[in-house]
Amino acid sequence: QHYALLGIAAYYECTRDTLASRWLMEGYAHLENYFWDSRLLLEGYYDETNYDGSNPRNKSFNATVDAITTHLLYLYLMTEDPQYLQRLEELAHEIEVRLLGSMPYQAIGFVEKFNSNWGWNNNESLTIMGHVLKTGWCMGRIYQLTPQPDYLAAAESLVTHVWNRGYDQEYGGPYKDYNRLSGELLLWGLPDTTKAWWQMEQAITA
């Protein structure tokens, strides 16, 4: 659902169009009302709901990190409203606790899929180096807004992890997909190692 706001947020940033502003704020309100889990110690965005907004469930990398890059960061930069900074800090905390917190127990990367209570979904073992890099970029960007040393340390740790464990030191560029439990590079039937353009972009921004 976060990506539904990406284009609207970018358009509003460029034009300050009042209709785009209304769409953006209505979309943000929908996410806050139906997707945000406010339970103590379990805070975070749910991954999905039913079409009518009922039965919110599961959490994930996407539900957490993509909220930052699709709209929250830009809402704060455009308005300097402290409510958006507070949400960014809450998401930074979840990144530190849930994503980075899982890394010592993986062969590579971090857990990307969780149940509603942040329990690991070990039926999904995929970890993507572009996601690790994107998370590092987000932590660095939030550090620029509120310079807490642990945010910078987290950003450096994530980027260094990819450099040391998931980067092609011979030809350059981050590899793409791994099994986080075994550390196996996933080739998906291809005869050679897999990379992707968007992961190169994430590496540059990180």
Where are the regions that the model predicts?
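Glycan-recognition and catalytic cores of secretory/periplasmic carbohydrate-active enzymes
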Residues: 1-206
